[in-house]
Amino acid sequence: MDEITTILDSARPVDNIINDLKRKSVCVPSWEILIKAYEPSFHEISKDTITRKDKIRKDGTKEEASRIYIGLEKLLTKRMTEFMFAIPVKRIYHNTEGFEVRQQIAKAIESIYKYARIDTENIKRANAYFASCEIFTIWYVVEKPNTLYGFNSKYKLKCKTYSPMEGVKLYPLIDELDDMLAMSFEYTKKVKDEEITYFETYTADKHYKWKQNGKGWEPVGTVEQIRLMKIPGAYALR
C-alpha cells in the first residue's frame, strides 16, 4: 500500500490516523507567532515601560506615556494584495474563434467564477496568504437547480478559503516529489451552543470527516467519494 492508503487504513484507530495526518510536511511559521507582528496592538511598544516611562507629577498623579503603534505589517499585506488583485484577473481563452462549443465552455467557466464571486475571494485569499503564509481554497458543489452557467444545471459550484487567520489549522501532506497526497484541516464550529472541533481530509478519491468527542475522535457520516480523482482545492504557502 502507498503512504496515504496506509495512514487511512480503516483498521487503524482514528486517533492514530489523525495524528499521522497532522504531521505537517511543510515548514510555515505559526499564526500565533505571525499575529504578533501583523496586529499592531500586539507590538512591544503597547506595553513598553522601559523606553516609554510614565510620568509621575509632583502631586502624585500619573501621566501615562503615549504609546503609538503603527501597523506597517498590516499595511504591507494590504498593499501586496492590491498589487495582485486591485484590478480583477482577466482570463484569456485561446483557440475559441470559430468553435461554438469552445466559446460556450469559456462562457460557462467565466460564469462559474462570476457567481462564485472570485474577485472578492481573491482579495480575501491574498490577504490571508500574505498575513498567515498559507491558505487552502476548496471548491465544492451544492445541489441547487439553476441556469447560471448558460445551461440547465442541477448543481452550483462554490468555493471557500481556509487560513490560520480564521482559526483553521492546515495540514498538507506532500511527498518527496512535491505531490500532494492529502489535504487536511481542523476547525471549531458552534453547534447548538456547543463548540465542536472537526477534522477533514481530502485525498484524490475520498473526503473524510471526523469530530472530536471528549479526548478522542469519531467519524461524521460516511466517506464521500470524489469522482474528479483530484483533491478539489488549491493550497498555497510562502
Q: Each predicted region: which residue ranges?
A:
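Structured, contiguous alpha/beta core segments that scaffold functional sites
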Residues: 131-132, 138-238
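Extended, helix-rich architectural segments
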Residues: 1-165, 174-178
